[in-house]
C-alpha cells in the first residue's frame, strides 16, 4: 500500500477553493506515488469532478442508518453516490458520539462500499495518567468492525491543533497496540501534522500514512508535505 495522506478540511473551504485545489493536485499527481484523500465539507463533495487515479475524495462523517428521520445527517450511500470512497469516523471534534455508534457507522460505511478511517486516541488526562495504551486498546475493541477493510487513525486528542506531537517511539508503541488488535491493519497518525514535522513522522516504524488538518488547506504547503513524504519513501 502507498503512503496514505489524508486531508481533513473540517469546516473550512468553499466549493470553488476545493475545485481549484483538486485542479492543481491533478496537475501534480504524475509526480506523486502516495495515495491522497481529500475530505472537504459536505457542500464541496465532488459529484462529477475529474480525479486522477491516486486522488480520492472522502467525507468527515456519516450516519449509521441508511435513511430515516435524522435531520442534518447524511448516509454512507449518499456519500458513495457523490463519489466518495473514504469517510473519517469517530473524530474527537464530533462530541457526544459513543464507541458503539462509531462502530455502527464503520460497519454501515463498509457495507455501502466506503473505506472508513476510524479515529482513536487518548486525551491529556489519560496521557498524564500513563493510560494511553489502555485507552486506545479499549477504543479498538469498542469501535473497530470485525469484518471489512478500514484504516485506523491514531490521533491523540491533546495533540490536535496544539502543535505538540508525541515522540516517534510513543507513536510506534501505540501503532503496535492497534495492530495487535486489528491483525496488522493500516495505521496512520493525526494530530498537529505539519511541514515542519512530516519528515520526522515519516520515519516511524509501521506508520502507513498521516491525517492532516489545517496544514492541508493551503495547496502549496500541502504539496510540500507530500513532497517530503515522497523523499522519505
UniProtKB/Swiss-Prot annotation:
<comment type="subunit">
    <text>Homodimer.</text>
</comment>
<keyword id="KW-0324">Glycolysis</keyword>
<dbReference type="GO" id="GO:0004807">
    <property type="term" value="F:triose-phosphate isomerase activity"/>
</dbReference>
<feature type="binding site">
    <location>
        <begin position="8"/>
        <end position="10"/>
    </location>
    <ligand>
        <name>substrate</name>
    </ligand>
</feature>
<comment type="pathway">
    <text>Carbohydrate biosynthesis; gluconeogenesis.</text>
</comment>
<dbReference type="InterPro" id="IPR000652">
    <property type="entry name" value="Triosephosphate_isomerase"/>
</dbReference>
<dbReference type="GO" id="GO:0019563">
    <property type="term" value="P:glycerol catabolic process"/>
</dbReference>
<comment type="function">
    <text>Involved in the gluconeogenesis. Catalyzes stereospecifically the conversion of dihydroxyacetone phosphate (DHAP) to D-glyceraldehyde-3-phosphate (G3P).</text>
</comment>
<protein>
    <recommendedName>
        <fullName>Triosephosphate isomerase</fullName>
        <ecNumber>5.3.1.1</ecNumber>
    </recommendedName>
</protein>
<dbReference type="InterPro" id="IPR035990">
    <property type="entry name" value="TIM_sf"/>
</dbReference>
<dbReference type="Pfam" id="PF00121">
    <property type="entry name" value="TIM"/>
</dbReference>
<feature type="active site" description="Electrophile">
    <location>
        <position position="91"/>
    </location>
</feature>
<keyword id="KW-0413">Isomerase</keyword>
<dbReference type="InterPro" id="IPR020861">
    <property type="entry name" value="Triosephosphate_isomerase_AS"/>
</dbReference>
<feature type="active site" description="Proton acceptor">
    <location>
        <position position="155"/>
    </location>
</feature>
<dbReference type="GO" id="GO:0005829">
    <property type="term" value="C:cytosol"/>
</dbReference>
<dbReference type="GO" id="GO:0006096">
    <property type="term" value="P:glycolytic process"/>
</dbReference>
<comment type="pathway">
    <text>Carbohydrate degradation; glycolysis; D-glyceraldehyde 3-phosphate from glycerone phosphate: step 1/1.</text>
</comment>
<dbReference type="GO" id="GO:0006094">
    <property type="term" value="P:gluconeogenesis"/>
</dbReference>
<comment type="similarity">
    <text>Belongs to the triosephosphate isomerase family.</text>
</comment>
<dbReference type="InterPro" id="IPR013785">
    <property type="entry name" value="Aldolase_TIM"/>
</dbReference>
<keyword id="KW-0312">Gluconeogenesis</keyword>
<dbReference type="InterPro" id="IPR022896">
    <property type="entry name" value="TrioseP_Isoase_bac/euk"/>
</dbReference>
<keyword id="KW-0963">Cytoplasm</keyword>
<feature type="binding site">
    <location>
        <position position="192"/>
    </location>
    <ligand>
        <name>substrate</name>
    </ligand>
</feature>
<dbReference type="GO" id="GO:0046166">
    <property type="term" value="P:glyceraldehyde-3-phosphate biosynthetic process"/>
</dbReference>
<feature type="binding site">
    <location>
        <position position="161"/>
    </location>
    <ligand>
        <name>substrate</name>
    </ligand>
</feature>
Amino acid at each position: 500500500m502507498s503512503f496514505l495522506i489524508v486531508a481533513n478540511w473540517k469546516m473550512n473551504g468553499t466549493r470553488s477553493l476545493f475545485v481549484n485545489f483538486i485542479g492543481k493536485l491533478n496537475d501534480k499527481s504524475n509526480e506523486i506515488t502516495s495515495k491522497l484523500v481529500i475530505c472537504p465539507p459536505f457542500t464541496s463533495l465532488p459529484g462529477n469532478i475529474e480525479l486522477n487515479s491516486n486522488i480520492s475524495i472522502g467525507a468527515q462523517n456519516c450516519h449509521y442508518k441508511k435513511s430515516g428521520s435524522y435531520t442534518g445527517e447524511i448516509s454512507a450511500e449518499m456519500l458513495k453516490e457523490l463519489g466518495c470512497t473514504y469517510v473519517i469516523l469517530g473524530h474527537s471534534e464530533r462530541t457526544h458520539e459513543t464507541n458503539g455508534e462509531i462502530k455502527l457507522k464503520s460497519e454501515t460505511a463498509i457495507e455501502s462500499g466506503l473505506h472508513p478511517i476510524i479515529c482513536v486516541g487518548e486525551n491529556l488526562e489519560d496521557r498524564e495518567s500513563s493510560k494511553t495504551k489502555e485507552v486506545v486498546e479499549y477504543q479498538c475493541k469498542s469501535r473497530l468492525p470485525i469484518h471489512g477493510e478500514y484504516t485506523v487513525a491514531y490521533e491523540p486528542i491533546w495533540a490536535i491543533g496544539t502543535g505538540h506531537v508525541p515522540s516517534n517511539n510513543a507513536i510506534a508503541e501505540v501503532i503496535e497496540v492497534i495492530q495487535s488488535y486489528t491483525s496488522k491493519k493500516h495505521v496512520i497518525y493525526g494530530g498537529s501534522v505539519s511541514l515542519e514535522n512530516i519528515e520526522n513522522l515519516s520515519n516511524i516504524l509501521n506508520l502507513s500514512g498521516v491525517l492532516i488538518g489545517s496544514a492541508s488547506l493551503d495547496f502549496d504547503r500541502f504539496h510540500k508535505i507530500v513532497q517530503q513524504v515522497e523523499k522519505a519513501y
